[in-house]
């Protein structure tokens, strides 16, 4: 579990902001949301496969030339 040390004379809001930033960097919240409910292995494979297809289409769109406008 990530933690921070509150500096002397540091406002509470700043300490909370630093804590949120460290949590975001470690990816703890995203992992927690992913593990919140059980996902069947087939559903997980299907979701990952769909994400891979989406990434592939996005990469292909950026690599292709724009259509000629004449």
Swiss-Prot record:
Q: Which PROSITE patterns match?
A: RIBOSOMAL_S21
Signal peptide location? none
Q: Name one GO biological process term.
A: translation
- Short name of any one Pfam family annotated for the protein: Ribosomal_S21
Highest taxon listed in the record's lineage? Bacteria
Q: Which Gene3D superfamilies match?
A: Ribosomal protein S8
A GO cellular component annotation here is: ribosome
GO molecular-function annotation terms? structural constituent of ribosome
Q: Give the residue ranges for region: Disordered.
A: 40-70
Task: Give the compositionally biased regions (Basic residues).
Answer: 45-61
- Please provide the record's keywords in A-Z order: Ribonucleoprotein, Ribosomal protein
Which positions form S-S bridges?
none
Tell me the protein family, please: Belongs to the bacterial ribosomal protein bS21 family.
- What name does UniProt use for this protein? Small ribosomal subunit protein bS21
Please state the gene responsible for encoding this protein. rpsU
């Amino acid at each position: 579990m990530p933690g921070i040390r509150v500096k002397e004379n540091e406002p509470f809001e700043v300490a909370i902001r630093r804590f949120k930033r460290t949590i975001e960097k470690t990816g703890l919240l995203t992992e927690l949301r992913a593990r919140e409910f059980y996902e069947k292995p087939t559903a997980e494979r299907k979701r990952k496969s769909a994400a891979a297809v989406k990434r592939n289409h996005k990469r292909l769109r950026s690599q292709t030339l724009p259509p000629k406008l004449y």
